[in-house]
Amino acid sequence: MSAMPKKFIVITSINHPTKALRTFSQLQDWQVVVVADRKTPTDWELANVKILTIEEQEALPLQTVKCLRWNHYARKNVGYLYAVMNGAELIYETDDDNIPYDSWESFFPLDLDGDVKVCDDSPKFVNAYHHFCDAHIWPRGFPLTQVLNQPGSTQLLKRPARKIAPVQQGLADLEPDVDAIYRLTIGKPITFSKNTSLYLAPGTYCPFNSQNTLWYPEAFPYLFLPASVPSRVTDIWRGYIAQRFLHMQDKGVLFFSPSVYQERNYHNLHHDFIQEIELYTRTEELVSVLDAYHADYAGIMEQLLQHQFVQQEDVDLFKAWISDLTQLGAM
């Protein structure tokens, strides 16, 4: 049996193999891992894809598995840890309805040497989508109070001299990641500009999701998805948390032109709207709490519990996550 690749694609799915998964399964040098949930078909199978069945997950030597609820998007946490267990050098995450373009693997190096577009003298929140199109559109999790503000100016800058981007967020064409308010009131398909990238310097925030996202090893600890919040919230909260801890290390997030297009699975938009309420009402408060936090990463869930962003369940789950990463030598 050939050795498992060191580059992983992590997905959780409750559907039979989709067009996106069949396409990803054909990529060379990448190991696709699908994390099953209670709703996943028991006969799920696809060549070149590792399906982590319920039984296999429960047999893993991971404390996180024992604490993690079923039927939640946070099931992806098991896939991240499985990748780390198997020596991951890169972790890419997506969903089963994001189909890669032929140019999908055109990622950026960790150290963005040379010129790159950087937000200059920007406000706290930057709508990255405005730098890839002229449409009235904003990413899921972007504060509604900031939607009508002008985008921050950008320049091609050589400073900061080093621009380190351990997390890189690709956009998605056709059905990009937007909130239910956008879909209910505008709902237009979008095609973003090509060959464009935007680095958000430390101190500048934009929500990023789990739908087309590359993580380098130094950011692996920040992959943790909370389970006590709705699935429409978990990756956005995770993204803001990750940005805060990257900023503390003088690092940032890179956004780049779409490497996938989305043929979106069915969603009840009214249900999405209800799930997203805290994104509409508490995002700025969350970032204020994060910016005021200066202790280590291991204590962040306790801090968020005090401000009622998560429940005790996530404090316990996060302790298990930190314990597992420590045992795996990834902390």
Question: What do the predicted segments below correspond to?
Answer:
Residues 40-88, 102-114:
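Active-site-proximal specificity loops/subdomain of glycosyltransferases
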Residues 97-100:
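Acidic metal-phosphate-binding loop of nucleotide-sugar-dependent transferases
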Residues 218-229, 251-273:
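Active-site donor/metal-binding and catalytic loop motifs
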Residues 91:
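Short aromatic/hydrophobic "clamp" motif used to bind/position activated sugar donors
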Residues 1-31:
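N-proximal low-complexity "stem/linker" segments adjacent to membrane-targeting elements
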